[in-house]
């Protein structure tokens, strides 16, 4: 297991513990369709679920169909399926199933079912953080192979800007005549700017390695434009177009500069009726602008099912293809399947 993941794990646990109850002001009001009126704190609304924190009960999840109305005097970012974004507070209206949103001089009445996202723009650093982490391992005596995988991400959100750090690693050790070690590792730091509910500009910097492909390291930057084709409370689908610049080092020491086009798509499907289930898929095609005939394909599939509050089981698959690997002994393809246990925090 890489020491980087252990450091990431400890930092994430520290963040999640530190933000649990600090600065929490439970002054928001939720009107439930069953007639209950609940007082607590709006944590966020996403993927058809309102995360509402209450004293003694912790954070409950309420589906959008169960919300009659909602009141919060916090400064919020509210996105709707009609390609509108509002900034301000949220208040009840004269009609159930509708809310009043915006600032004092610019307010609209919208339907709760039209809301895609509510995100508090908190003044406190810790309350802007959310993320997850997972870890898995398996051993096969038949071929003397040990595999360990770990991943995690931390997100930080402001009014129109967002930042994300992601880490992934897949390591395997197999004892034959000698100990064979293969590894795939990714560090990714990205930032995005919200142009509208459907359009975002994204900048990414990262480092990746894959010994199976003969790649010791790839340092890269990407500038891209992202558009959401589908954005509902049950699924999202987007496509990305961009340009990447990178420096590669092979396992034999060869260095190479590259410029690539980036065409990608991401899809999320989610169901939040116990147990919570989410499925994520991404794929990217990267034609090389410098080396004629070279192109790469990168894809991943991630499924998670909740076992109890904030903890989940995960299954992950990745597949990578490089038509002309930089390493002389590199393979053109690499893929893996891994399972693990994870924890998420908001």
Language-model segments: which ranges?
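Repeated loop/turn-to-beta-strand initiation elements of outer-membrane beta-barrel proteins
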Residues: 159-165, 198-201, 232-237, 270-279, ...
